[in-house]
Regions:
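Short, polar/charged loop or turn motifs at beta-strand boundaries
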Residues: 489-515, 529-532, 548-550, 593
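Non-catalytic regulatory/gating segments with a bias toward low-complexity or hydrophobic composition
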Residues: 513-514, 566-568, 587-589
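Beta-strand-rich structural segments
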Residues: 39-67, 144-149, 169-179, 226-227, ...
Length: 672
């Protein structure tokens, strides 16, 4: 925030502004930034290609969306592994630590070959629905990204205007002019220029009076918005330009000191940034990998991600090659940019995000009567974690709601909730609020395969003293069968989760599992298929347990995930086999014993559950492809000791940000 304030007030002295208008404009921009501090994420992994069953080691960089400093306030970051059908394979929750947001995702055994996506976000980022943070990884082969072919539709602000706004980059200056063949442009217009909501110019413009912006006066790099405003500060025309990304970069050097090789064949490698300012430090992640190809144009990196991908509405993950040629000009002409809502902000329409910043984990719910579903006021709710020795108690409010805040425990922690009336009676119904995670509904970045296997037999490291080089060993075994379509009903289902699917996903409850099914939504504990709208109102899907239908108000939390063998979802014409009751869709649950009885469920005032706790970082195991993985390095320079054999056929990749928000990206072969 300090850097943002400095840049904004510095702009006041670099532009010719009307004092009153300028002060109002700046106050509105600052108010919007304070009301809604936006964030961006970037995922750095230990590789780009994997095999089924391997572990993806990762670090998430969480930065302020405006100045790219790591001063964002969210405490948690969520990372999802999405399969080629956009379904969540794994989801982890990372907590802020001294190393940043560091964690891992284990790829399930048996997943199909394909391009998968790592999707990262905070709860605060969910306030923006058209800006996704995606990173492609390839399982079962190598691939590269292709530039997305955007349509010819342009920003809706430009579509109804006959005024031509021209922006020309001429060496070290930007020339801005307006033209309207059908009008003399006698109206009063102003030009407003900003980069990620930081105002860089505001002043009058007219036909025949061009605006010249010098390189030195533009303090930011990335996507620039040039807005033509009328006398009411309403945007008439907007044009986007990708300019001066070097202003956001902090170049670093990696030097291999071969002359200082130690007796154990370790060679120093010095990483430093000569352009660091006073007090500025680096916060980077690093990996050393086997360099089997030098073609990196089909990969994305932190520079293109923060400066381009996350600043364009509905923009997919783009390869770095897009920013190295004139392709970005055409792409921006077909995109819109409303992330920072500047067209509204300059008119005084400042808004706060509907979803608050997540600063602590919360367990909440409602207590109501068994008959009539009336709220129980001043009810007593106990929260117990037997394996952590934790106990807390609270009371319900007038609406019967309760909340436990600051529940920070690792993943897999088990909890027990029980509720009573003020008089200590247990004849109540306890409803638990479940965490909702948005499904990814956007398009998939285009790509192409470059090879079919990620096994690198030629990447064997030098054998240590006394080591033995073994011949290739093949291991054969019978794959266990997990049939998810073992009967006539299941074979006609539109979507099924078998036992292996349930085990690999690790869902904590049935609602979390069902949220992964396309067109299935969960609202207030009820499941709806395709919206569930009928003539007589909104109706949930029918629930069948071991082939027997239960009442609409049946609580699926009564079924423990350890008892579930299969879940089948019927949402199309397949519901006909269930009769009229299946008109709004059917969710069929098959238990392992096959004799589930509603009478055997736990008490209505008690719930045992497991939340999505934070992940505990684990140590890295080096492998032939990535022998070195350092997710968190902080300082002004770094000295690494690496084996001498890394000097050939290995490259080092360093990415991160500085304390001043400058972006670091370096790729180079060691020893060169």
């Amino acid at each position: 925030m300090r850097k943002l304030l400095f840049i904004i007030f510095l702009t006041c002295f670099q532009t010719s502004l009307y004092a009153q208008t300028n002060n109002v404009l700046l106050s509105r921009i600052l108010r919007q930034v304070q009301l809604f501090p936006q964030e961006k994420t970037y995922v750095f992994t230990d590789a780009d290609s994997y095999q089924a069953g391997q572990r993806i080691n990762l670090r998430v960089f969480l930065v302020n969306a405006v100045v790219h400093q790591a001063d964002s306030v969210s405490r948690y970051v969520y990372v999802e592994l999405l399969n080629p059908e956009r379904l969540v394979v794994k989801r982890v929750r990372l907590i802020r630590s001294d190393q940043g947001f560091v964690g891992h995702i284990d790829i399930p055994e048996g997943v199909v070959k394909g391009r998968y996506l790592l999707r990262s976000y905070t709860k605060n980022m969910l306030n923006l629905s058209r800006y996704e943070s995606l990173k492609s990884i390839f399982i079962g082969g190598h691939g590269k990204l292709l530039p997305f072919k955007y349509g010819d539709t342009i920003n809706i602000i430009n579509s109804n205007s006959k005024i031509i706004l021209s922006i020309n980059k001429l060496n070290k200056v930007i020339k801005v002019s307006i033209k309207n063949p059908s009008d003399s442009l006698n109206s009063s217009y102003r030009l407003f220029v900003h980069c990620r909501s930081i105002p860089l110019y505001f002043g009058k413009i007219s036909q025949g009076r061009d605006i010249i912006l010098s390189y030195d006066s533009l303090s930011q790099g990335g996507i620039y918005s040039f807005q033509l405003l009328d006398s009411n500060l309403k945007t008439v025309v907007e044009k986007l330009k990708f300019l001066y990304p070097e202003k956001e970069q902090c170049p670093i050097s990696v030097k291999w000191i071969a002359a200082e090789k130690s007796n154990d064949k370790q060679t120093p490698c010095i990483i430093k940034a000569d352009s660091l300012r006073e007090g500025e430090t680096m916060d980077v992640s690093l990996r050393v990998e086997y360099a089997e190809t030098n073609d990196l144009a089909g990969e994305s990196n932190i520079l293109s991600h923060l400066l381009y991908d996350m600043d364009v509405a509905d923009c997919l993950e783009e390869p770095t090659s897009v920013l190295s040629n004139n392709e970005s000009e055409r792409l921006l002409d077909s995109c819109s940019w409303n992330r920072y809502r500047m067209a509204d902000v300059i008119r005084g329409e400042c808004k706060k995000g509907k979803i608050g910043i997540e600063k602590s984990a919360v367990i909440s719910g409602r207590v109501e009567t068994l008959v009539g579903h009336k709220a129980i006021k001043e009810g007593i709710v106990n929260l117990i974690s037997p394996d952590k020795g934790f106990y807390a108690v609270t009371k319900t409010d007038a609406q019967g709601r309760f909340s436990f805040e600051g529940i920070d425990f690792p993943e897999g922690t088990q909890y027990v909730l029980n509720a009573f009336t003020k008089a200590g009676k247990s004849w109540v119904k306890l409803l638990l609020d479940e965490e909702e995670f948005p499904a990814y509904k956007g398009q998939l970045p285009p790509f192409e395969w470059t090879s079919n296997d990620t096994t690198r037999v030629d990447a064997t490291l030098e054998l240590p003293k006394g080591g033995i080089q073994m011949e290739e060993v093949n291991i054969f075994s019978h794959q266990p069968t997990y049939s998810s379509r073992s009967d006539a009903y299941a074979r006609t289902a539109d979507f099924s989760f078998g036992l292996r699917d349930i085990e690999s996903i690790g869902a904590t409850c049935l609602h979390e599992l069902l949220r992964r099914v396309p067109s299935v939504t969960v609202e207030l504990g009820k499941c709806y298929v395709r919206g569930g709208t009928a003539v007589d109102g909104k109706r949930p899907a029918a629930i069948a347990i071991d082939g027997i239908f239960v009442n609409d108000d049946y609580d699926l939390d009564n079924i423990q995930m350890s008892d579930v063998e299969r879940v089948d979802v019927f949402k199309g014409g397949s519901t006909v086999i269930w009769g009229a009751i299946g008109g709004m869709g059917v969710i069929s649950i098959t238990t392992k014993k096959g004799d589930f009885k509603a009478a055997s469920v736990p008490l209505t005032n008690t719930k045992a559950f497991t939340t999505l706790g934070y992940q505990i970082p684990q140590s890295y195991t080096p492998n032939a492809h990535t022998p070195v993985w350092l997710p968190s390095l902080r300082g002004s320079s770094f000295r690494l000791l690496l084996p001498a054999e890394y000097r050939s056929n290995y490259r080092i990749i360093v990415e991160g940000v500085t304390s001043e928000g400058r972006i670091i990206h370096y790729v180079g072969e060691l020893g060169k």
